[in-house]
Amino acid sequence: MENNRTGRRTVRRTAGAVAAAMRVNRQLSIPIVTTALALALAACGAGATGQNVGAKSTAQGGGSGPSAEYTDDISVGVKPDQNAVKLLPAAVKAKGTLSVAMDLSYPPTTFMASDNKTPIGFNPDVARLVAAELGLKLQINNVKFDTIITGLQANRYDFTVSTMGATTDRLKALDMVDYFKAGTGVSVPYGNPQKLGTHTLCGHHVGVTSGSTQELQWLPQLSKQDCTSKGKPAIKAVSLPSVNDALTQLVSKRIDAVMYDFVALEWAATQQPKTFDVLKPLVTTKPVTVALKKDSPLTPAVQAALQAIIESPKYAQALGRWGLQDLGIKTAATAVPQD
């Protein structure tokens, strides 16, 4: 979940789970983060956008995201949307299959089920729904995130559903269509003993990962907005190598809070009960996108399919079962740069 992936399950507590979760830093065992959670959270932090999961947090926190696997095909029963189907290129319609690229190592949006063969998460759900709305079969390709764009450009895949943020550079190479939101959140110790809020962090030590958008943009902006511009002490940024380090320091009370991709923080709270609370409101949310090769003849059909999904009950179902219910959008708009 790159800090703007702004990207993807139940973290399996077995050797197989650790391997599959290899890029998501998440599951803290007091006073340090367990290996499985660390690997899981690493994945979230390495994604495409700075992912977020909007589970049932409250102003006081209270991570309560999904803890079950949903391996059923959410697209069962979906009838093709004829307005989208009529936009399909003849070659794609004749082939009868859509090829999607995604990196299946980002719970809870994009990952592998405990059977180690079934792609699950919000992004596979959306990809399956896109194919169903277009009356096509779906082929899911599990590839490294940093190879997806070149794969699209080389026509190895038709599209990607990877929680990918729209940047100026990406928009030069890709067609990008919004499909939900992701953002930055703040975690505090369970029970929020200091009664902190997203906008009451002045003077407190807040962990951020080195080089992240949280360190470079969102924490300084929040500090100026809420604190220094009002004569209050600045938020004290504590730069750390990884979110795993930050959450470990939070558990050991060396810092007061952690600012990071919301999806990773919420998943950590879900997988390690009574360890963290995730504050509401979020620091920021921005749309993330489905992407295709620049000027792809398939883009209009995929965009129409996404709009049909958003307007259907399946969209709320997919968001809700992965703890993303606060992050839906109403329009599958052509993306604009978010950098």
Where are the language model's segments positioned?
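Extracytoplasmic small-molecule ligand-binding "clamshell" domains
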Residues: V53-V161
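Bilobed "Venus flytrap"/periplasmic-binding protein-like clamshell domains
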Residues: P107, K117-E133, M164-G165, G185-S242, ...
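Acidic, polar ligand-binding/catalytic clefts
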Residues: K137-T200
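A ligand-binding cleft/hinge motif common to bilobed small-molecule-binding domains
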Residues: M164-L171, L219-P220, V251-T284
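Periplasmic-binding protein-like
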Residues: K181-V188, E266, T270-Q307, Q325-D339
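Extended ligand-binding regions for polar small-molecule ligands
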Residues: S57-Q82, A132, N192, H199-H205, ...
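Bacterial signal peptide processing site
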Residues: G45-A48
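C-terminal motif of bacterial Sec signal peptides marking the signal peptidase cleavage site
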Residues: L39-A43
